[in-house]
Amino acid sequence: MIEFGNFYQLIAKNHLSHWLETLPAQIAAWQREQQHGLFKQWSNAVEFLPEITPWRLDLLHSVTAESETPLSEGQLKRIDTLLRNLMPWRKGPFSLYGVDIDTEWRSDWKWDRVLPHLSDLTGRTILDVGCGSGYHLWRMIGAGAHLAVGIDPTQLFLCQFEAVRKLLGNDQRAHLLPLGIEQLPALKAFDTVFSMGVLYHRRSPLEHLWQLKDQLVNEGELVLETLVVDGDENTVLVPGDRYAQMRNVYFIPSAPALKKWLEKCGFVDVRIADVCVTTTEEQCRTEWMVTESLADFLDPNDRSKTVEGYPAPQRAVLIARKR
């Protein structure tokens, strides 16, 4: 059973304590009413993993845990089998005592693009919206964050996160809650808020930006990463039924348009930090994610387009400050 009591105890002692007015009731309702049909199977996989304290833990350059002496073949097989019960693994990679989880996305590449543009994370309290399996939460801790909180309603991601946490010695510096941003009150408590790979899934992108702003302290930093298209500040792509085979893509602005949106929501010091085309090396099918991936979503005769004829995915990172 995945419990959240440690997180409640943690925030009861800090500036997030007012979250306890709503959070426990929301989690209790989720536990009663909203659990996925496979959640018991997934949580059992987490429960059956061994409790290991790493001899060496690297969160600065990767998410890697090592033991002082190599694990036995039987121990490795047990860990490998249980982690494979949590497939598909989309965000990573992870290297855990010799079990290497080769995820669909090279999320470490994204982190390498984002990190140089951030304010120093040392001592910061961070919120990561739509955090997936929590890979970037661990990298935030590695970069010096005091506390990294992720929210993502996808319950498989919660179990993947808890599996990794258990294999990292039950590290309590990062936490994942099975919530969406719309379920959070205006906490105004986080020094840095990340929203990476979320905005284009929102029917009202400006509302999402306001929700992110409501989580930041004054002078806090927003890190926004999302799909963009080429164009000026008035360019926005509104796909039809699908974009790169995804049904839930609503608005893809140009980077200049996105900058304008942020300014309209009251953010200041907005800058476009990075724009890059997503490659089939960064997002691809692996033995830990065996279904279709980016290569299947691009026009086989023109890789600059999706199968629907839209511009192929490119992603921008924008940094902004709450005034």
UniProtKB/Swiss-Prot annotation:
Gene Ontology BP term (one): tRNA wobble uridine modification
Q: Which GO terms describe its molecular function?
A: methyltransferase activity; transferase activity, transferring alkyl or aryl (other than methyl) groups
Q: Which UniProt keywords apply?
A: Transferase, tRNA processing
Q: Where does carboxy-S-adenosyl-L-methionine bind?
A: 91, 105, 110, 130, 152-154, 181-182, 196, 200, 315
Q: Which reaction does it catalyse?
A: carboxy-S-adenosyl-L-methionine + 5-hydroxyuridine(34) in tRNA = 5-carboxymethoxyuridine(34) in tRNA + S-adenosyl-L-homocysteine + H(+)
Q: What is its EC number?
A: 2.5.1.-
Pfam family of the protein (one):
Methyltransf_9
Source organism superkingdom = Bacteria
Quaternary assembly: Homotetramer.
Its biological purpose is as follows:
Catalyzes carboxymethyl transfer from carboxy-S-adenosyl-L-methionine (Cx-SAM) to 5-hydroxyuridine (ho5U) to form 5-carboxymethoxyuridine (cmo5U) at position 34 in tRNAs.
Give the protein family: Belongs to the class I-like SAM-binding methyltransferase superfamily. CmoB family.
Q: What is this protein called?
A: tRNA U34 carboxymethyltransferase
Q: Which organism is it from?
A: Salmonella paratyphi A (strain AKU_12601)
What taxonomic classification does the UniProt entry list for its organism?
Bacteria, Pseudomonadati, Pseudomonadota, Gammaproteobacteria, Enterobacterales
